[in-house]
Amino acid sequence: MERDNGTIQAPGLPPTTCVYREDFKRLLLPPVYSVVLVVGLPLNVCVIAQICASRRTLTRSAVYTLNLALADLLYACSLPLLIYNYARGDHWPFGDLACRLVRFLFYANLHGSILFLTCISFQRYLGICHPLAPWHKRGGRRAAWVVCGVVWLVVTAQCLPTAVFAATGIQRNRTVCYDLSPPILSTRYLPYGMALTVIGFLLPFTALLACYCRMARRLCRQDGPAGPVAQERRSKAARMAVVVAAVFVISFLPFHITKTAYLAVRSTPGVSCPVLETFAAAYKGTRPFASANSVLDPILFYFTQQKFRRQPHDLLQKLTAKWQRQRV
């Protein structure tokens, strides 16, 4: 083996077939994933429990939020395997099937969250910009459940190839779980990876920005309804827009920018291992931002839903009062 600026390159292989020295992953990913697991798992369970407890009065946005929390919960359940893997220095002992499943769950959560947040934003857009139009109110919750079913089918179709490309391999005498694909399949993965970014992120992000631009113009107009109820409605819509945009910018945008750059460089012939390793480190360094979406989503829910935000406070007051009565 031949060392090249900290990157190991096997002799006789193409210059872009490198084995990276990624010690930063052991320091960065286990703590971040542990926080996401410890914080995100109970938060999403609470969101699901609260929405299910109010199932008779569910709005369309609540139905979308419930499915968003389910996607986050499924991903959080896969994190213990990744925490163990990176804490052991990128050693994967769980087999090829578990590797494919974990990679699929990551991208299914990522693109499911993007689409469900887009659905929530579009529902808010309809309520603000077309409040009296009857066509978007037909079907009620049943229509929302149909939309969620379509979203899950689309996400599964989008992300199923990740389970095909992801695989285990041997590097430095240990088994690793490739995130995107083995290096030998990098050229074949490129069209799919780029299409997934465009269809699974860029198009929903563009639609979301268009909705929020229309909403901002409508909210800034002075000829709308007046009064405290209308003002509260506008404030709630503004909060939703700011928080959802923040989730996209923090969680999704850096990850997709660095992933796209890495895919392009990885598939370019003649790229040296140090350059390739730099792009790989940038891409893998933004993975925690994408994972943080499982924590940010339930915070978004509580920040924008006043009714559900009051429930934990009321429950805490009841428990405190009961505890004080027992002490007397």
UniProtKB/Swiss-Prot annotation:
Protein name: P2Y purinoceptor 6
Gene that specifies this protein: P2ry6
Membrane topology, as annotated: Multi-pass membrane protein
Matches recorded under Gene3D superfamilies: Rhodopsin 7-helix transmembrane proteins
Known tissue expression: Abundantly expressed in various tissues including lung, stomach, intestine, spleen, mesentery, heart, and, most prominently, aorta.
The keyword Transcription regulation belongs to this UniProt entry's keyword annotation: no
Disulfide bonds: 99-177
GO biological process: cellular response to prostaglandin E stimulus; cellular response to purine-containing compound; cellular response to pyrimidine ribonucleotide; G protein-coupled receptor signaling pathway; phagocytosis; positive regulation of ERK1 and ERK2 cascade; positive regulation of inositol trisphosphate biosynthetic process; positive regulation of release of sequestered calcium ion into cytosol
Domain of life: Eukaryota
Function as written in the Swiss-Prot or TrEMBL entry: Receptor for extracellular UTP > ADP = 2-methylthio-ATP > ADP-beta-S > ATP = ATP-gamma-S. The activity of this receptor is mediated by G proteins which activate a phosphatidylinositol-calcium second messenger system. Functionally coupled to phospholipase C.
Source organism (scientific name): Rattus norvegicus
Family as reported in the entry's similarity comment: Belongs to the G-protein coupled receptor 1 family.
GO cellular component: apical plasma membrane; basolateral plasma membrane; plasma membrane
